[in-house]
């Protein structure tokens, strides 16, 4: 399923096999289509052209709309959105704890009010697994609690202990669902999630415990939620030695181009983030020289592509001046072109990281780009 084919320090070059789409080359950036669509008018066919290997959709949102039962009746998420590559679905836990209101947490799960219409919903480990089974994703994420930052130590400890018990229940229900004769995807995999807030001892203890459960991969969750970047890196460095070396490692919700490079340097294989699409919709674009705001007046007569070093469909066809005009005119096309460029950049970044690992020069790549890509131009 997962094979490390080369290492440089902690950085890993790997291959990951899925039921859909064959082999994924890692490190990989997963393109976020929360509601089975990329915000900005980008469809599944565009994703192929943009170099996407894995698409990520959200259990919470799809459960509310259109309903996971609808997706199941349509043949699963792959058929529903016409995407033939791998799909990862997150468990809904993060959204329950960040979007929903009036939450009540018990050992069984969480009762909360929908952010759409306020109706009461219960979600626990079994419910999350059933929803993700209906969606038929390649990778299902375990149901967990993502605590607020900062979190009190005692609460973080109780929470990660409960998340461990929830993972055991997720695993049992996931195995049961995969064995059903009418399973949408009987080969669906399950990833466990490490929690523990910013406390290294809790993080290490929790990772040691969940590693005993036979999951197909493991994620580090609960980061990039307001803690300083150096704290995030410290937690990754503390947890990584306890993550099974023969299974993929996923850093959830991260992050900037520099974060991805630094995450790879610390042994991470999978990344996802809404940043490329979200920033794009506000005119903030990534280039190999740093980040730019295409709305700036200095680009009004600039006939160069967004990034002369980029060969994405947007940079091959349109000028900075034109894209700036689209934003000024509030044309929907502005969002589509900007999102396409940023997603291509992120997918290309992952490819260049893989290429540097193949060539044995990842540290050179890291030195050249980790800081540069954080600059504003």
What label would you give each PLM region?
Residues 161-164, 173, 177, 185, ...:
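Glycine-rich phosphate/ribose-binding loops and adjacent secondary-structure elements
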Residues 22, 55, 90, 132, ...:
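Conserved, mostly hydrophobic/aromatic
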Residues 136, 167, 171-174, 178, ...:
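Structural signal for hydrophobic packing residues in well-ordered secondary-structure cores
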Residues 1-184, 297-300:
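Non-catalytic, usually N-terminal nucleic-acid engagement modules in DNA/RNA processing proteins
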Residues 127, 131, 135, 158-169, ...:
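A non-catalytic, amphipathic alpha-helix used as a structural packing/dimerization or gating element
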Residues 1-15, 24-31, 40-41, 144-150, ...:
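C-terminal extensions of enzymes
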Residues 149-152, 157, 217-223, 332-335:
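Glycine- and acidic
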């Amino acid at each position: 399923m997962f094979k490390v084919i080369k290492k440089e320090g902690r950085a890993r070059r790997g291959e990951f096999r899925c039921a859909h789409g064959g082999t994924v080359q890692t490190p990989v950036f997963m393109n976020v289509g929360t509601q089975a669509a990329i915000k900005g008018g980008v469809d599944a066919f565009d994703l192929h052209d943009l170099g996407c290997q894995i698409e990520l959709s959200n259990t919470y949102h799809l459960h509310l709309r259109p309903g996971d039962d609808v997706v199941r009746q349509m043949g699963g998420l792959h058929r529903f959105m016409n995407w033939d590559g791998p799909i990862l679905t997150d468990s809904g836990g993060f959204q329950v704890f960040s979007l929903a209101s009036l939450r009540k947490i018990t050992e069984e799960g969480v009762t909360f009010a929908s952010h759409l219409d306020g109706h009461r919903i219960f979600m626990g480990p079994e419910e999350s697994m059933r929803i993700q089974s209906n969606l038929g994703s390649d990778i299902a994420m375990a149901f967990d609690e993502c605590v607020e930052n900062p979190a009190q130590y005692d609460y973080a400890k109780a929470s990660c202990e409960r998340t461990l018990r929830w993972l055991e229940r997720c695993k049992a229900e996931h195995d049961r669902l995969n064995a059903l004769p009418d399973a949408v995807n009987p080969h669906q995999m399950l990833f466990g999630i490490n929690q523990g807030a910013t406390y290294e001892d809790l993080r290490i203890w929790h990772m040691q415990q969940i590693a005993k459960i036979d999951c197909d991969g493991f994620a580090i969750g609960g980061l990039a939620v307001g803690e300083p970047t150096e704290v995030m890196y410290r937690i990754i460095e503390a947890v990584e030695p306890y993550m099974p070396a023969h299974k993929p490692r996923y850093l959830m919700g991260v992050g900037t181009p520099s974060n991805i490079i630094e995450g790879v340097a610390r042994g991470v294989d999978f990344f996802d983030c809404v940043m490329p699409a979200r920033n794009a919709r506000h005119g903030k674009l990534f280039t190999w020289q740093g980040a730019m705001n295409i709305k700036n007046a200095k680009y009004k007569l600039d006939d160069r592509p967004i990034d002369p070093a980029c060969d994405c469909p947007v940079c091959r066809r349109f000028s900075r001046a034109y894209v700036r005009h689209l934003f000024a005119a509030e044309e929907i096309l502005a969002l589509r072109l900007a999102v396409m460029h940023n997603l291509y950049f992120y997918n290309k970044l992952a490819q260049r990281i893989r290429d540097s690992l193949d060539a044995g020069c990842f540290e050179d790549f890291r030195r050249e780009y980790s800081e540069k890509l954080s600059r504003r131009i």
